[in-house]
Swiss-Prot record:
Keywords: Aminotransferase, Antibiotic biosynthesis, Pyridoxal phosphate, Transferase. It comes from Streptomyces kanamyceticus. GO terms for molecular function: pyridoxal phosphate binding; transaminase activity. It catalyses: neamine + 2-oxoglutarate = 6'-oxoparomamine + L-glutamate; 2'-deamino-2'-hydroxyneamine + 2-oxoglutarate = 2'-deamino-2'-hydroxy-6'-dehydroparomamine + L-glutamate. This is 2'-deamino-2'-hydroxyneamine transaminase.
Amino acid sequence: MSTHPVLDWSRSAEHLRRSHGVTTDPRPDEDGHYPCVLTRGSGTRVYDLDGNAYLDLTGSFGSVLIGHAEPAVVRAVTDVLSEGNLFYTGASPRRLALAERLLDWFPWSEQAIFYRTGSCAVSAAARLAQHATGRNRVLSSGYHGWHDWHLEAVPEAKPKTFESYATEFHNDLALYRSWLDRHGEEIAAVVVTPEPHRFDHAYYQELREVAKEHGCLFVVDEVKTGFRAGAGGFSALAGIEPDAVTVSKGMANGHSISAVVGQRQLTQELSEAHVWSTYQNEQVGFAAALASLDFLERHDVAAVTRRTGEAVRQGVLQLFAEHGLPVGAPGWGPMFELDFDAADEGLAERLEAALLRHGIFCDTGDDFNMMFHTAEHTDELLERFAAALGDL
């Protein structure tokens, strides 16, 4: 039986108390299950206000793919800050260079349009599709951010008078076909988020073909998978060529940038659709993305994180079995999640707290996201995981 480590979170507690009085962020601080305030990171480790160190399994919602404060990315960003970050004209050498790199990454694509967040990119893609097709409605499945068009998937967030132009088909292929058979002439686009551990490639190929049959643009929300999957994103692995993909997380190793990468039929509607903003041409994001893409390609990060993810996933499954805990770990390559459906109520919260005490920062209700540098700490990670299970 392991002993319960006692960590000092006193400075973090005072900071959280003060913060809750003047600012708020329900993700993930407000619910109180993270007693620490993270202040810096290096490689796979993050550090809190009290000086405690943790191995990071969140990858900052999956946005950090290489590792925190990767020197090559830091240097690129520092160079930009000494030159100025935002200018009135959008054209810049860095924007052009990044657009060309993205067209190489997704070789079927013709243009790239840049934004700041994944939510912005997917919302832009939906509106661009409406203008490109002259149709109004969107069929979607999966999570696409917080913007209004997607509120059909989050009914508790909808204002009382809100009417969405998007309809969720919840990955139900029969419902999807039915909607398109009955309303295909109204559907501008189908927007899907890949869930590789739940559906095979044939499923996504069928979604794509049915959309094409009805003249609907097909958009793959690769905000999380676009760079974790390697060149071509998940779309290439699935053997499909969409009309557009949206990308963000992992592209700039934690810096804010996103893009719609697609066919000119869709992207040429930019001016008429009015989907641009002041900050979409920040140089910091371009520089961070270029440096990150150099690293991803030079070190074959997708292959490394796939191997690491599978090693950690199998190790975690073995530990659960050794402790007699009915917890699954469905996943795909560089990311996996924990399945507590057959476990006792409250186990997820208890495990998360135990892991934190043993120096693993994670969210048991979300994906475990591998970073490139996680490979250097696989044994340590599993040792800490085993110690945490011993505390339950």
